């Protein structure tokens, strides 16, 4: 038996998927609750990581070290960068994950780990610095399982768009338009979050295929929470994930 792991930072980001699991049992690893169940014939592990890179990396490592994990889906909400073409409620699928903070600040600006020659992960001649390409086969498999106009449990599919592109993982969410424009220009990214690159790094270490999907809850740089919609973002993201099974 091999498992597909589904991770989200907070319970509200994956509650609908949890409710869809059959034959649920619970285990505890390093103080974390791991939920084991079945979804459309697939053996599933679910875990809420908590916010941030360390929580995310620790959670992914706990699962991979204790269960035979064949693939991992990281999901939740995220902030879209201006000029990404995404709006609140849309879905972003990561083509790659990028650490947005790791590197060095010089008098000439930010430089990546590759620029200073320090890899995060090495597999022989293959070296990973700030960027981790996500699994193309799992990405294609996910896209291929989405019908052109699939019905959703809570409304019409045409209410949002799905777009793939680079994600940036940050330690501090972007709260100014200047910073949002800077990160968008530097990485050509569509979406930011606080966990994805850390999970992608762990998956690279263990050679586990990974897919990341996020619902857009806000526009990065916009701190007026009255304009955010966490519920819509998480609902749409979960509906898309469920369509893949």
Regions found by a protein language model. Give the residues of each.
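Structural motif
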Residues: 70-73
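Active-site-proximal beta-strand elements of phosphoester/diester hydrolases
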Residues: 45-49, 164-168, 213
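His/Asp/Glu-rich mid-to-C-terminal helical/loop segments that flank catalytic regions of hydrolases
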Residues: 220-245
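A C-terminal functional module that forms or caps the active site or interfaces directly
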Residues: 170-212, 221
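N-terminal short beta-loop-beta anion/metal-coordinating cradle
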Residues: 1-61, 66-67
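Mid-sequence, gly/pro-rich, charge-dense loop/helix-turn segments that line enzyme active sites
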Residues: 82-146, 159-186
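Glycine-biased, low-complexity coil/linker segments
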Residues: 154-157
């Amino acid at each position: 038996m091999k498992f597909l792991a589904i991770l989200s930072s907070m319970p509200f980001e994956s509650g609908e998927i949890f409710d869809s699991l059959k034959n649920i049992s619970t285990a505890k690893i390093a103080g974390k609750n791991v939920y084991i169940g079945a979804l459309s014939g697939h053996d599933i592990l679910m875990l809420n990581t908590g916010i941030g890179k360390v929580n995310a990396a620790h959670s992914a490592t706990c699962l991979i070290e204790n269960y035979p994990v064949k693939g991992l889906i990281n999901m939740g909400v995220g902030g879209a960068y201006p000029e990404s073409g995404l709006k609140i409620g849309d879905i972003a699928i990561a083509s790659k994950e990028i650490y947005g903070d790791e590197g060095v600040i010089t008098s000439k600006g930010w430089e990546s780990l590759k620029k200073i020659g320090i890899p995060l992960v090495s597999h022989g001649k293959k070296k990973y610095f700030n960027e981790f390409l996500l699994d193309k086969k799992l990405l294609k498999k996910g896209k291929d399982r989405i019908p052109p106009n699939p019905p959703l449990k809570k409304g019409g599919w045409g209410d949002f768009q799905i777009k793939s592109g680079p994600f940036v993982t940050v330690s501090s969410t972007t709260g100014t338009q200047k910073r949002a424009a800077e990160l968008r220009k530097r990485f050509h990214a569509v979406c930011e979050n606080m966990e994805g690159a850390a999970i992608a790094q762990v998956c690279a270490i263990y050679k586990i295929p990974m897919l990341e999907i996020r619902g857009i809850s806000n526009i990065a740089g916009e701190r007026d929470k009255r304009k955010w919609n966490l519920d819509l973002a998480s609902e749409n993201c979960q509906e898309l994930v469920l369509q893949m099974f």
